Regions:
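Iron-sulfur (Fe-S) cluster-binding modules
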Residues: 1-6, 22, 38, 212-221
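N-terminal leader/targeting and pre-domain segments
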Residues: 2-29, 109-137
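Local sequence-structure signature of Cys/Sec-based thiol-disulfide redox active-site neighborhoods
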Residues: 11-58, 133-168
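Acidic, two-metal ion nucleic-acid-processing modules in DNA metabolism proteins
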Residues: 11-12, 22-23, 45-54, 58-61, ...
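Thiol-based oxidoreductase modules, predominantly thioredoxin-like and allied folds used
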Residues: 35, 59-72, 168-184
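Structural micro-motif
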Residues: 73-91, 97, 186-198
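Non-catalytic, surface beta->alpha helical segment in thiol-disulfide oxidoreductase systems
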Residues: 89-122, 196-221
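Structured core of small recognition/catalytic domains
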Residues: 153-221
Length: 221
C-alpha cells in the first residue's frame, strides 16, 4: 500500500475476514472506473478501499480490474458508467450492480454484504417476488441516492441489488452523493434514500421489495 495510512485497522481486517470473506464462494470482480480529472476528489480513496478489502491476506476471491473513465470510453458506454469513481460488482449477478462514490459509513458493511451475495448467488427476497423479477422482459434502471450517514439507505440499496442479481435486464445503481452535488441537484435529492426507476417513477424512503416491484411495473406501463 506504500506510504498511505491504512483505512482498516487489524480489528476491522479480522472482522472482514471472519464475518464476510469466510462466506465467499466464487471469485468476484470489482470493476473500478478511475479518473484523471482533478475534480474527482474521491477517486483515490475508493481505489484504496477496494485494494484494502481485496488484500490477498484476507481472501483470494476478489479481483480488482481498473479502467480509466476518460480513456476506456467503449467499455464505459457498454456498462453505462456515467461518472467516476464507479465500482461494478461482477460475479453470479445477471444484471449490473454499480456503486458510484465512496462505499463508506453505513454503506460500507452493505457493500461487503453485496460482494458476498454476488459470490454465493444467494438472493434474500420472497419467492413470489423472485418469480416476478425473473419474469421482467423490459430494461429496468434503478437509481438509489444515498449518503454515508443514512441508516435506512443500505436496506434500499440491498433490495435493488437483489433485483439486479436475478435479471440481466436490470441495472441497479447506488449513488453516494458526497462526490456528486451535480447529480443530487439534477435529480432534486433533498432526502435520502431517494429512488428513481427508469428516470420516470420516483419516491423518497426505504421500501419493501413488494413496493419496489409495484413501482417498476408502474415505470414500465
Amino acid at each position: 500500500m506504500g506510504h498511505q495510512h491504512r483505512l482498516l485497522d487489524d480489528e476491522n481486517r479480522r472482522i472482514l475476514k471472519e464475518d464476510y470473506w469466510s462466506k465467499l464462494d466464487s471469485t468476484v470482480k470489482l470493476v473500478y472506473f478511475n479518473s484523471e480529472d482533478p475534480t474527482c476528489q474521491y477517486c483515490g480513496l475508493v481505489k484504496q478501499i477496494l485494494e484494502e478489502i481485496s488484500d490477498p491476506e484476507l481472501t483470494d476471491k476478489l479481483e480488482i480490474i481498473e479502467y480509466n473513465f476518460e480513456r476506456d470510453i467503449d467499455l464505459r458506454k457498454k456498462l453505462g458508467v456515467l461518472k467516476a469513481p464507479a465500482t461494478l460488482i461482477q460475479g453470479k449477478n445477471k444484471g449490473l450492480i454499480k456503486y458510484y462514490g465512496v462505499p463508506a459509513g453505513t454503506e460500507f458493511p452493505a457493500f461487503l454484504e453485496t460482494i458476498v451475495h454476488v459470490s454465493t448467488g444467494d438472493v434474500h427476497l420472497p419467492d413470489e417476488i423472485i418469480e416476478e423479477v425473473e419474469g421482467l422482459e423490459n430494461p429496468v434502471n434503478i437509481k438509489v441516492f444515498v449518503t454515508t450517514s443514512c441508516p435506512y439507505c443500505p436496506r434500499m440499496v440491498h433490495t435493488s441489488y437483489m433485483f439486479a442479481m436475478l435479471n440481466r435486464r436490470i441495472e441497479a445503481e447506488a449513488w453516494e452523493l458526497s462526490g456528486f452535488p451535480d447529480v443530487a441537484s439534477q435529480y432534486g435529492v433533498y432526502a435520502v434514500p431517494k429512488v428513481v426507476v427508469n428516470e420516470k417513477v420516483e419516491w423518497e424512503g426505504a421500501v419493501p421489495p413488494e413496493y419496489l416491484m409495484r413501482k417498476i411495473r408502474e415505470a414500465l406501463e
